[in-house]
Curated annotation (Swiss-Prot):
CDD domains: alpha_hydroxyacid_oxid_FMN (cd02809)
Signal peptide: none
Reactions catalysed: (S)-lactate + A = pyruvate + AH2
Family of this protein: Belongs to the FMN-dependent alpha-hydroxy acid dehydrogenase family.
Keywords: Cell inner membrane, Cell membrane, Flavoprotein, FMN, Membrane, Oxidoreductase
Name listed for the protein in its UniProt record: L-lactate dehydrogenase
Subcellular location: Cell inner membrane
FMN hydroxy acid dehydrogenase domain ranges (all copies): 1-380
Natural source organism: Escherichia fergusonii (strain ATCC 35469 / DSM 13698 / CCUG 18766 / IAM 14443 / JCM 21226 / LMG 7866 / NBRC 102419 / NCTC 12128 / CDC 0568-73)
Example of a GO MF term: L-lactate dehydrogenase activity
Enzyme Commission code: 1.1.-.-
Gene3D superfamilies assigned: Aldolase class I
Residues binding substrate: Y24, Y129, R164, R278
Cofactor(s) annotated in UniProt: FMN
Length: 396
């Protein structure tokens, strides 16, 4: 299969992966309206072409939390990454490290903190949920700090798991799920050999280390259902600060008032995110929410964004809408499932090239020069009425 764009990796991953795994990352909540709008809204943001600007000294480098990044991109936390490629977290972290960008390890990774951290040179980031078991949270923070993790990504938009109907049809959950997963695995030999047999153990590495016993996919599903804490509040940030003195990023912000609260409570950054459309269907896309949030807190806190980013043009669009850096999730997981570390490395190269083309043709020599001036301001005349708020910097 020819890979010429990031979108090609999705088609390749669908061929390689058992359906329960492909649809787990590809799907969203309920009718998947927000999942679709994430991509569609962002793709319709019109860039302003400029020419004859002498772009010979273009640079994608940026700095975030005193870390130099080769481009304003980090790999997002993705649960069960090690089920998509053999020791997937290690491979993805290696690709990010080689490209000079951060890798974020999920709470519910297959590979534990202690397996991933020693394999890379730059400090990785660690993602944490608010859980009923505060002992686990404290243990995870202490282990992340001991392993040299530099930044904590605190996910706050999951006090309860979203309803993902596609999972019941694919075999991730629903009737006879274990039997359906087994049959899917044996009928996808490339995955079965590389990951199913040679990628063991398929534990939830960080949780197994805490519990002192192996954990599997059924444990993952049950643990998610029973451990998320609906009592989460801003006071939990104060508790976390007792155990974490590094940069802390609040992931799951869609409203300007929540962004202001993050500033007031001393967070170092926020991620404008709807969890990739996997939590509450019908909320704003990140592209729609971002301009108003940037108007509210730009300069007071680092603004990251995810959800719907599929290529280098999307990265430039998100930065023009107000983000400082973006997180890639699904896009890199498709590449990882297709070709492991080499796939992620190639994806990052594609994104870098696409960013350079977009910046060259919009006249932005550096990341700091990408702004709303890089967009067509009369979007209400160029785009459907539903996207007009993007031009004005207001949420719909």
């Amino acid at each position: 299969m020819i890979i010429s764009a990031a979108s090609d990796y999705r088609a390749a991953a669908q061929r390689i992966l058992p359906p329960f795994l492909f649809h787990y990352i590809d799907g969203g909540a309920y009718a998947e309206y927000t999942l679709r709008r994430n991509v569609e809204d962002l793709s319709q943001v019109a860039l302003r072409q400029r020419v004859l600007k002498n772009m010979s000294d273009l640079s994608l480098e940026t700095t975030l939390f005193n870390e130099k990044l080769s481009m304003p991109v980090a790999l997002a936390p993705v649960g069960l990454c090690g089920m998509y490629a053999r020791r997937g977290e290690v491979q993805a972290a290696g690709a990010a490290d080689a490209h000079g960008i951060p890798f974020t390890l999920s709470t519910v990774s297959v590979c534990p903190i202690e397996e991933v951290a020693p394999t890379i040179k730059r400090p990785m980031w660690f993602q944490l949920y608010v859980l009923r078991d505060r002992g686990f949270m404290r243990n995870a923070l202490e282990r992340a700090k001991a392993a040299g993790c530099s930044t904590l990504v605190f996910t706050v938009d999951m006090p309860t798991p979203g309803a993902r109907y596609r999972d019941a049809h694919s075999g991730m959950s629903g009737p006879n799920a274990a039997m359906r997963r087994y049959w899917q695995a044996v009928t996808h030999p490339q995955w079965a050999w590389d990951v199913g047999l040679n990628g063991r153990p398929h534990d939830l590495g960080n949780i197994s280390a805490y519990l002192g016993k192996p954990t599997g996919l059924e444990d993952y599903i049950g643990w998610l259902a029973n451990n998320f804490d609906p009592s989460i509040s801003w006071k939990d940030l104060e508790w976390i600060r007792d155990f974490w003195d590094g940069p802390m990023v609040i992931k799951g912000i869609l409203d300007p008032e929540d962004a202001r609260d993050a500033v007031r409570f001393g967070a170092d950054g926020i991620v404008v995110s709807n969890h990739g459309g996997r939590q509450l269907d019908g909320v704003l896309s990140s592209a729609r929410a971002l301009p108003a949030i940037a108007d509210a807190v730009k300069g007071d806190i680092a603004i990251l964004a995810d959800s719907g980013i599929r290529n280098g043009l999307d990265v430039v669009r998100m930065i023009a809408l107000g983000a400082d850096t973006v997180l890639l999730g699904r896009a890199y997981l498709y590449a990882l499932a297709t070709a492991g570390k080499a796939g992620v490395a190639n994806l990052l190269n594609l994104i870098e090239k696409e960013m350079k083309v977009a910046m060259t043709l919009t006249g932005a020599k550096s990341i700091s020069e990408i702004s709303q001036d890089s967009l067509v301001q009369e979007l209400d005349k160029a785009l459907p009425a539903a996207l007009a708020p993007l031009a004005k910097g207001n949420a719909a």
